[in-house]
């Protein structure tokens, strides 16, 4: 009889007879693999993986991984599926059930047991992993160990700010600053020293005047000075044009006030374009019909700076 005819004859048989023929009293890896249609080697490999918690070993660190293999992995070796299923079928409630129901309940119970064991391993491995992590970080951040193994400092802040709380509890300068005895009450330019757990010290330059050496700050300051100079030239040229055209100027300071009012919106633009805008406004002075010049004349009129009339002469 060929293999094809053998499989066809098996399909015509009832399921109960097939189970009795291939599973006999207990499900062994070879029988289950034959029943499911896998080869003996493939079925054995699948059942070996499913019947042990080694699936989760790849998600743990080396410490938890060794624990999984050394404690849980030998269970299917010393207590084979045959013995487990044999004892399971002897239970008062299970022994009165059919073979198919016993097999189904056994697989479900076995799966739930593996889940419980995996949960215990994950909890224990997570604790060991966090312990190692806290010890490693305590070498760089003082007080981070928080009372765990390898540390003798106070526990961390329960709010979750571990790095901030560890610095506050270990650095005495922090408490001096809170009392106003250190940087917050001292003059600018004081250098505070922060000592790490390794004993080395790092000078923290708290001089607020150091920003004056920043290239960007220097460039902004240089452009601001140029804008101020252009604005001064605008005031002088406006005064000169008004005098040439016969305007009456009660107070020369009103010219500066009027120009400040008119140029307010132009002073709010970016510093890189402000200087070019000021030069443009400077070139608009005295041009009849120019928007900026006409607005400046209207503002000057509010300060009683007008052309002299014949009665004034």
From Swiss-Prot:
Keywords: Membrane, Mitochondrion, Transmembrane, Transmembrane helix. It is a multi-pass membrane protein. It is found in: Mitochondrion membrane. It comes from the Eukaryota. One of its GO terms (biological process) is respiratory electron transport chain. The chain crosses the membrane at residues 41-61, 68-88, 102-122. One of its GO terms (cellular component) is mitochondrial membrane. A stretch of 270 kb of the mitochondrial genome is duplicated within the centromere of chromosome 2 resulting in the duplication of the gene. The expression of this duplicated gene (At2g07718) is demonstrated. Belongs to the cytochrome b family. This is Uncharacterized mitochondrial cytochrome b-like protein AtMg00590. It comes from Arabidopsis thaliana (Mouse-ear cress).
């Amino acid at each position: 009889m060929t293999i094809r005819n053998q499989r066809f004859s098996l399909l015509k048989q009832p399921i109960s007879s097939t189970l009795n023929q291939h599973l006999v009293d207990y499900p062994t890896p070879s029988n289950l693999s034959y029943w499911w249609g896998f080869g003996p080697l493939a079925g054995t490999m699948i059942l070996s993986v499913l019947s042990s918690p080694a699936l989760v070993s790849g998600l743990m660190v080396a410490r938890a991984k060794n624990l999984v293999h050394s404690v849980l992995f030998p269970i299917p070796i010393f207590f084979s599926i045959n013995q487990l299923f044999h004892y399971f079928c002897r239970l008062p409630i299970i022994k009165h059930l059919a073979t198919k129901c016993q097999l189904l309940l056994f697989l479900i119970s076995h799966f739930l047991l593996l889940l419980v064991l995996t949960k215990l391993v994950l909890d224990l491995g997570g604790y060991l992993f966090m312990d190692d992590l806290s010890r490693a970080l305590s070498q760089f951040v003082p007080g981070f160990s928080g009372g765990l193994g390898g540390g003798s400092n106070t526990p961390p802040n329960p709010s979750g700010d571990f790095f901030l709380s560890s610095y506050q509890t270990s650095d005495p300068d922090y408490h001096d600053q809170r009392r106003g005895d250190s940087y917050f009450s001292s003059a600018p330019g004081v250098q505070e020293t922060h000592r790490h757990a390794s004993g080395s010290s790092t000078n923290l330059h708290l001089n607020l005047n150091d920003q004056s050496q920043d290239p960007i700050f220097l460039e902004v300051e240089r452009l601001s000075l140029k804008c101020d100079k252009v604005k001064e030239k605008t005031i002088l040229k406006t005064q000169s044009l008004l005098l040439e055209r016969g305007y009456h100027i009660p107070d020369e300071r009103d010219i500066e006030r009027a120009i400040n009012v008119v140029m307010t919106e132009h002073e709010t633009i970016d510093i890189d374009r402000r200087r070019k805008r000021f030069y443009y406004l400077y070139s608009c002075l005295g041009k009849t019909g120019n928007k900026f010049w006409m607005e400046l004349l209207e503002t000057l009129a509010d300060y009683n700076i007008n052309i002299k009339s014949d009665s004034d002469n």
